[in-house]
């Protein structure tokens, strides 16, 4: 339309007019679910909890001549339309997040109305809504009556064709290079604006009676192939990353990478692989092989659910470690209680095989060792030793497959509490484990080792660098004992109902006794270090399992999922490394964390290239 001049006396937006009616609360409709899936596919780098995507027009950010309907996606004009002072606009609910990289929306012209004085574009928060987009500073629009583009000015520039009833106009914002182009009926019209600021809102404006438009923020497939355009820019950004110049420092760069890989292998216990890598690259290994294998063995025990044995082994190889880390010790004991409920800890699997020593002070007891009891000089370290979890249950509920743990072979001979001949228990090579232990001192450099052929794990099969040998009998996080009862008393609606400890009364009593001792340990730690809410929550969550006849199907049953052993395993492994003055996290993981944080900072700073340089794209 003809160029318009700014009118300082123009009216202000009306707040709270919801003539279109907002969608009601409750469960997401199928349409909303499909929208969420499409937006996630288009903009995977966007954290919608921090920076929500536009999904509709805002009933609180529009001029009073604008009416909304159909879920705030349809806009109609309800003013007089006498002149430019009657123009009215509406902004979307949220600005375009920089992490989109490329953002696109479409507007269908349902009716051009009397004159077709319509504008489609972008505007910043606070721009006057009594104007068409493009007429004011930080406002940009493409107008249908004359095909002109308006860039923060009342004077338009020739840009594209006019548009009318039935046309679909798209607006694409490139947050990487700060440009914007429009499409008409699926065809690009070329660059309209450059040097765009951040935090712009999709905006439409109408001026004459009868004008109606519908927005598509992803509710329906777009006419324009925006995903092809995104692929083009993703290739450009990734090409920039790949071509980053390092030739002048190539030798230094390679040495850094080799050290990062070596330390990662050592951290997670890939002993043989780390040794072979060090031999090929001449990279020194900071930790002795014996210590690596000791950590590997401890991790293996934790991931199998044999936490009592893991505690005893840790105390043997690294005396004083757990007693100086009461939070870690308490977390391990709580996890042991959970595994006793699960039926995987040797305390309930091998009741009849405990030696006199273990009966007197068995490895599974929650009591602190008399030799290493905590003193007032010990620090109560909550952050370094315990991840944010309850009983080793990560705060983010994992949905990973429960069947990732291969079946164990036979009973353990490395611990007096696991020497049962139960067919479902796990062991190590006696010649490489038990015998060597008898003749070696209890230290972090003990030569108790298991042969590489038994203890080394293949990285592609065992994430986290530890052998995952949970029994294939694990179903939904529950250990199915040989004596699991499935008679009439354990049937529920014709389906087998799992019972605590397979219905074994002695094992159930052992769990209850262990729980009392665990409660006593909690009270002891409370007296020495003060009350810890995290400890209280761990204890409550663990004890809650006993309130249900089928703990695996109860509301807190996710604790029994084998995947929940991993944060406990990681915390213990990090504490061992830290006690040896080694990094508790491998430098490779720190570098990945730094890269991820840099990308988040780029998004907050409005640098759109962060969307196409995601760390996950480089992890294979």
From Swiss-Prot:
Protein name (Swiss-Prot/TrEMBL): Ran-binding protein 10
Region (Disordered): 1-34, 347-459
Annotated CTLH domain residues: 291-348
Originating species: Bos taurus (Bovine)
GO cellular component assignments: cytoplasm; cytosol; nucleus
Ranges of biased composition (kind: Polar residues): 347-398, 437-450
Ranges of residues in domain B30.2/SPRY: 35-222
Residue ranges of every copy of the LisH domain listed in the record: 253-285
Segments passing through the bilayer: none
Pfam families: CTLH, LisH, SPRY
Function per UniProt: May act as an adapter protein to couple membrane receptors to intracellular signaling pathways. Core component of the CTLH E3 ubiquitin-protein ligase complex that selectively accepts ubiquitin from UBE2H and mediates ubiquitination and subsequent proteasomal degradation of the transcription factor HBP1. Enhances dihydrotestosterone-induced transactivation activity of AR, as well as dexamethasone-induced transactivation activity of NR3C1, but does not affect estrogen-induced transactivation. Acts as a guanine nucleotide exchange factor (GEF) for RAN GTPase.
Family: Belongs to the RANBP9/10 family.
BP terms from Gene Ontology: cytoskeleton organization
Compositional bias annotation for Low complexity: 409-436
Domain notes: The SPRY domain mediates the interaction with MET.
Modified residues (Phosphoserine): 361, 365, 367, 369, 422, 451, 453
Modified sites of kind Phosphotyrosine: 362
SUPFAM superfamilies: Concanavalin A-like lectins/glucanases (SSF49899)
Keywords of this entry: Acetylation, Cytoplasm, Nucleus, Phosphoprotein
Assembly notes: May form homodimers. Identified in the CTLH complex that contains GID4, RANBP9 and/or RANBP10, MKLN1, MAEA, RMND5A (or alternatively its paralog RMND5B), GID8, ARMC8, WDR26 and YPEL5. Within this complex, MAEA, RMND5A (or alternatively its paralog RMND5B), GID8, WDR26, and RANBP9 and/or RANBP10 form the catalytic core, while GID4, MKLN1, ARMC8 and YPEL5 have ancillary roles. Interacts with RAN and RANBP9. Interacts with the HGF receptor MET. Interacts with AR. Interacts with TUBB1. Interacts with YPEL5. May interact with TUBB5. Interacts with DDX4.
Location of this chain's protein in the cell: Cytoplasm, Cytosol; Nucleus
InterPro entries: B30.2/SPRY, B30.2/SPRY_sf, ConA-like_dom_sf, CRA_dom, CTLH/CRA, CTLH_C, LisH, SPRY_dom
Residue positions where N-acetylalanine is found in the record: 2
């Amino acid at each position: 339309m003809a160029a318009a001049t700014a009118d300082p006396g123009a009216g202000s937006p009306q707040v709270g007019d919801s003539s279109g009616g907002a969608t009601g609360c409750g469960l997401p409709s199928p349409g909303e679910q499909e929208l969420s899936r499409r937006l996630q596919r288009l903009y995977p780098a966007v954290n919608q909890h921090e920076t929500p995507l536009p999904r509709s027009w805002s009933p609180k950010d529009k001029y009073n001549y604008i009416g909304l309907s159909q879920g705030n996606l349809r806009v109609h004009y309800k003013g007089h339309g006498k002149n430019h002072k009657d123009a009215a606009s509406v902004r979307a609910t949220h600005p375009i997040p920089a992490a989109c990289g490329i953002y696109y929306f479409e507007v269908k012209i349902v009716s051009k109305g009397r004159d077709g004085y319509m504008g489609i574009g972008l505007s910043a928060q606070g721009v006057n809504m009594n104007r068409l987009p493009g007429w004011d500073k930080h406002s940009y629009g493409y107008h249908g009556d004359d095909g002109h583009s308006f860039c923060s000015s009342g004077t338009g520039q020739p840009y594209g064709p006019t548009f009318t009833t039935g046309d679909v106009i798209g607006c694409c914002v490139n947050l990487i290079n700060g440009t914007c182009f429009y499409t008409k009926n699926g065809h690009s019209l070329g660059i309209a604006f450059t040097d765009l600021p951040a935090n712009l809102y999709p905006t439409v404006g109408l001026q004459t009676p009868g004008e109606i438009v519908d927005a598509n923020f992803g509710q329906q497939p777009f006419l324009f192939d925006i995903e092809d355009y995104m692929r083009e820019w993703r290739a450009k950004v990734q090409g920039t990353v790949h071509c980053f110049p390092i030739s002048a420092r190539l030798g230094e760069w390679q040495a850094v990478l080799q050290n990062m890989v070596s330390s990662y292998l050592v951290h997670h216990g890939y002993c043989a692989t780390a040794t072979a890598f060090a031999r090929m690259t001449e990279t020194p290994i900071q930790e002795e092989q014996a210590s690596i294998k000791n950590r590997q063995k401890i991790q293996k025990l934790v991931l199998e659910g044999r936490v009592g044995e893991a505690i005893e082994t840790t105390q043997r190889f690294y005396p004083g470690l757990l007693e100086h880390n009461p939070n870690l010790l308490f977390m391990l004991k709580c996890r042991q209680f959970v595994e006793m409920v699960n039926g995987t800890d040797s305390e309930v699997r091998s009741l009849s095989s405990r030696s006199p020593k273990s009966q007197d002070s068995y490895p599974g007891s929650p009591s602190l060792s008399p030799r290493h009891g905590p003193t007032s000089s010990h620090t109560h370290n909550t952050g370094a030793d315990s991840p944010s979890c309850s009983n080793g249950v990560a705060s983010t509920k994992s949905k990973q497959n429960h069947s990732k743990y291969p079946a164990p072979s036979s009973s353990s001979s490395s611990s007096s509490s696991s020497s049962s001949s139960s067919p479902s228990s796990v062991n190590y090579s006696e010649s490489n484990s038990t015998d060597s232990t008898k003749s070696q001192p209890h230290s972090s450099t003990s030569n108790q080792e298991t042969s590489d052929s038994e203890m080394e794990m293949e990285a592609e099969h065992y994430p986290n660098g530890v052998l995952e040998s949970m029994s294939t009998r694990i179903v939904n996080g529950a250990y199915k004992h040989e004596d699991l009862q499935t008679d009439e008393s354990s049937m529920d609606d014709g389906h087998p109902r799992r019972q605590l400890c397979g219905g074994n009364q002695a094992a159930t009593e052992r769990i209850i006794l262990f729980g009392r001792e665990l409660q006593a340990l909690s009270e002891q730690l409370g007296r020495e270090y003060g009350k810890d809410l995290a400890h209280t929550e761990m204890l409550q969550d663990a004890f809650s399992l006993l309130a249900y006849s089928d703990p695996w199907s109860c509301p807190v049953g996710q604790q029994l999922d084998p995947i929940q052993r991993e944060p406990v395993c990681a915390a213990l492994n990090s504490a061992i490394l830290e006690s040896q003055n080694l990094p508790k996290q491998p430098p490779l993981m720190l570098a990945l964390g730094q890269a991820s944080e840099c990308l988040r900072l780029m998004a907050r700073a409005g640098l759109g290239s962060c969307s196409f340089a995601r760390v996950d794209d480089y992890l294979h």
